[in-house]
Amino acid sequence: MAGCFRFVKEENTMTWRIVHICQSEKMQLKLDNLLIKKMGQDYIIPLSDISIIVAEGGETVVTLRLLSALSKYNIALIVCDNEHLPTGIYHSQNGHFRAYKKLQEQLLWTQEQKDKLWQIVTYFKINNQQDVLSMFEKNIDCIQLLANYKDHIEYGDKTNREGHAAKVYFNELFGKKFVRLTQQETDVINAGLNYGYAIMRAQMARIISGYGLNPLIGIFHKNEYNQFNLVDDLMEPFRQIIDVWVYQNLRDEEYLKYEFRLALTDTLNAKIRYGKETCSVTVAMDKYVKGFLKCISDKDTSKFYCPMVSSVEWS
């Protein structure tokens, strides 16, 4: 079974398996189940148990009936290329029974609201970057510089503290010669970061869609070609979970091997401190989006917390 797929259980979520499929021949719908065909063997998983499917292998056939069912169950499908790197996400566009009302509300978000929320999200992100450098006992001057950036973020981050912090952070974490690449992955560090970020992005997309939000309409990102502007906004403080895993596991490696890809998928099940409780990353994401919505509807930031990356424990 390991050659066909792996799955892991998520804590306290209505859908709880992340299915990693490698070199299967066909994925199709059988009643309300995912049917995986591999070398004459059939593997069946109830769709109600699945949150994400990661599919590798260029010869796999996926039926339209299955794609329709994945949308119905709000299951994200991540498709990987021949280098095993994620290149696309298929997700539901109808995850909420009052989608039109939610869209109307989202379109009424004011620029002031969006700028304030982006200020908070940027603070969370730089705070976690600072904590990561502290975890690994990096240069104290760089850590203090991030602290300074964090404490001087304007509404909407008009002075781009996020961008300045990112340069300092990556150069200190992975070395002065490190260059962050998102398209032409030339090294195992970038490959690991991109793979892990794609997993986080898919999970955030399905959670956001499940709450009736349109992922196209962000609070900061506004790329007309990006279907996930809001996802890319909100996932920023969760990226550092992947940074920590990559730093701990890939610095001495040459390739992003299969076991590493599985482990990166499993980061969604890592334990993390969110507010006053410790929960899985997936549960923290869900609570985080709820807190974001509370900020929008009631101007109440008391339930919108920074996920504490320094507390992460791998499952």
Regions found by a protein language model. Give the residues of each.
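N-terminal, Lys/Arg-enriched amphipathic/low-complexity engagement segments
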Residues: 5-42, 165
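Active-site helix-to-loop segments that bind/position phosphate- or nucleotide-bearing substrates
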Residues: 15-18, 22-25, 72, 84-315
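Glycine/small-residue-rich interface belts in oligomeric ring/scaffold proteins
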Residues: 48-98
